[in-house]
Amino acid sequence: MSERAHIPVLVEECLALFAQRPPQTFRDVTLGAGGHAYAFLEAYPSLTCYDGSDRDLQALAIAEKRLETFQDRVSFSHASFEDLANQPTPRLYDGVLADLGVSSMQLDTLSRGFSFQGEKEELDMRMDQTQELSASDVLNSLKEEELGRIFREYGEEPQWKSAAKAVVHFRKHKKILSIQDVKEALLGVFPHYRFHRKIHPLTLIFQALRVYVNGEDRQLKSLLTSAISWLAPQGRLVIISFCSSEDRPVKWFFKEAEASGLGKVITKKVIQPTYQEVRRNPRSRSAKLRCFEKASQ
């Protein structure tokens, strides 16, 4: 795993949110490679129970090895947000953390199919590799109208209609199985000016496919409807998002929860990475952190 995969996003800001009331119990529902977990366990000796979960078995294996030093304080489970929502909560937590979206480890492992930097690699994109549906299944089986909806709703792709049409046209002659196949099918769709921007034209298409394959909108809904009930009084829920389709529902859910008297929004203004962090870790540039504190009673 590359060194970049070891860099947790907005880690200092996360730690600072718990500085006044150091946590004793914590639930990390996107454990990943264990970057945030390592920082919390090192910074807070009071934290004797850190329950980490992830959908990705490969990530869990990396995290277990990385967190060996803290093995008596941390537990690991293979679970999605939906799984956790449907299970009894083992305890109440002083903090809950969700770092949404795809991890650097998943992007850098080209065989996982999350990155358009690959070529011959399979177009997979499954966070949980025990599930059946892959991104290539989606592109080869769904109707043009449904593909367009996915590109529009989950990727906010301006060329969603022509992209869907291009996929359907391409697959009449050849199945879309690899990352190179996607490039051949779609790169002619985008206007030239989009190739001169910082964000590659395929970024939004890949985002849309990933969100659909992994049911990320449904998973986020499960998290939001359950997470406050996992918190102890004055416990804090921290959610880091990377695109507007993730951040919008978090923002509105926190506002509604505050209006309902469940607690208060701590981040009246969203927290974003500093210039220094973005230089150190360019993938952090679109990160947005929001925090909600549960009421004391």
UniProtKB/Swiss-Prot annotation:
A Pfam family per the record: Methyltransf_5
EC primary class: transferase
Signal peptide boundaries: none
One of the protein's GO biological processes: rRNA base methylation
Catalytic activity: cytidine(1402) in 16S rRNA + S-adenosyl-L-methionine = N(4)-methylcytidine(1402) in 16S rRNA + S-adenosyl-L-homocysteine + H(+)
Keywords, comma-separated and alphabetical: Cytoplasm, Methyltransferase, rRNA processing, S-adenosyl-L-methionine, Transferase
Gene Ontology CC entries for this record: cytoplasm
GO molecular function: rRNA (cytosine-N4-)-methyltransferase activity
Binding-site residues, S-adenosyl-L-methionine: 34-36, 54, 81, 99, 106
Compartments where located: Cytoplasm
PANTHER family: 12S RRNA N4-METHYLCYTIDINE METHYLTRANSFERASE, S-ADENOSYL-METHYLTRANSFERASE MRAW
Family: Belongs to the methyltransferase superfamily. RsmH family.
HAMAP family: 16SrRNA_methyltr_H
Stated role: Specifically methylates the N4 position of cytidine in position 1402 (C1402) of 16S rRNA.
Protein name per the record: Ribosomal RNA small subunit methyltransferase H
Source species: Chlamydia pneumoniae
Protein's gene: rsmH
